[in-house]
Amino acid sequence: MAEPKPKLHVAVFPWLALGHMIPYLQLSKLIARKGHTVSFISTARNISRLPNISSDLSVNFVSLPLSQTVDHLPENAEATTDVPETHIAYLKKAFDGLSEAFTEFLEASKPNWIVYDILHHWVPPIAEKLGVRRAIFCTFNAASIIIIGGPASVMIQGHDPRKTAEDLIVPPPWVPFETNIVYRLFEAKRIMEYPTAGVTGVELNDNCRLGLAYVGSEVIVIRSCMELEPEWIQLLSKLQGKPVIPIGLLPATPMDDADDEGTWLDIREWLDRHQAKSVVYVALGTEVTISNEEIQGLAHGLELCRLPFFWTLRKRTRASMLLPDGFKERVKERGVIWTEWVPQTKILSHGSVGGFVTHCGWGSAVEGLSFGVPLIMFPCNLDQPLVARLLSGMNIGLEIPRNERDGLFTSASVAETIRHVVVEEEGKIYRNNAASQQKKIFGNKRLQDQYADGFIEFLENPIAGV
């Protein structure tokens, strides 16, 4: 008779951004469902933002005190959504101040494992000293993290040979096979201009942090699966000299949305009035910064496409202030502009939604495709263009055409792309492929559970797992 598996205590510690915290919470629930105890580490305000989880699960929330004395950091700012893009480096400075409280937690609770995020360069040496096993969990897909970073030694030593925007429009030298997963020139210029350094007290840039986080890990966990990008997952292991475990896509379900039944009832009532697969859902993320001209161009495109749409605009876009004059009045019979939180998974799972205009954050793209919704892609920065290239190659969505040098686009091209993906006969390939890949990969619960189970089995028996 087989011996019962030991019950573990696993601590998880995501970066201070909802796009990281939510998949870490998904992972926590999966681990807890196997009978293990999970300590979810963050700050008080971030913990309060998370959706409720079943009291049957042994998931304990551990609040660490984030410094409120860092210059230029707004009062009560505890997540990337609380600060402008130019001030995220100050949040990293405050985050680095959590090391002492984190050490005290490890000393007192003695978890078997710490699962930490890509910016947590100081976590692995603390954990190793205290005898805690270490896994880095990257919430990006493998191709994106390889293109962005490269081998750990290159990132730590600052030896990335790519010094200009033109260097980013071709594959990096550490990718040994042909690929079209690269930046376009206007995207590469944005990467070069991204505010990641130059703040007093923040001595390490993001690539150096990631490199050190890799080096200190025993295993790399990636939010992906072999059915999507096998060659990239294998390359990640080769580049970092570590075992890589794809954990699956951790797709959310409508039940995972935070409780706000009143909001959902209002939205559902509007969606229920429309035909199946006819509504265009537009959401460009909670933290994406886009220009006035881009908002105006998208708005005019939605007006021209003549399809019903539901557009969620969050604070980073300054919402309706940027919309064209008279836009709301002209589209009021078929369009909704929503400026508050929305239950995105519930919207995407509704039968009336036939297309998703997305910035191509990995989590958002996975959500849309887990419900079989084809994508209209408008990537903005960071990993988003790389995700768009990966998914475009699968014909499960179409990018809005943009000038490769300056990123300009026309409202007509927005309308044409939306109609092509959602209603026109020529775009049937995208609708069919999105539905097919939902069944095969993105919404395949059995497949995704197998990946998660494989990782948990590794935690339970790491020697055999490697």
Swiss-Prot record:
UDP-alpha-D-glucose binds at residues 286, 342-344, 359-367, 381-384. It comes from Arabidopsis thaliana (Mouse-ear cress). InterPro entries: UDP-glycosyltransf_plant, UDP_glucos_trans, UDP_glycos_trans_CS. One of its GO terms (molecular function) is UDP-glucosyltransferase activity. Keywords: Glycosyltransferase, Transferase. Belongs to the UDP-glycosyltransferase family. This is UDP-glycosyltransferase 91B1. It is an enzyme of class 2 (transferase). It comes from the Eukaryota. The keyword Transport does not apply. Its EC number is 2.4.1.-. The lineage of its organism: Eukaryota, Viridiplantae, Streptophyta, Embryophyta, Tracheophyta.
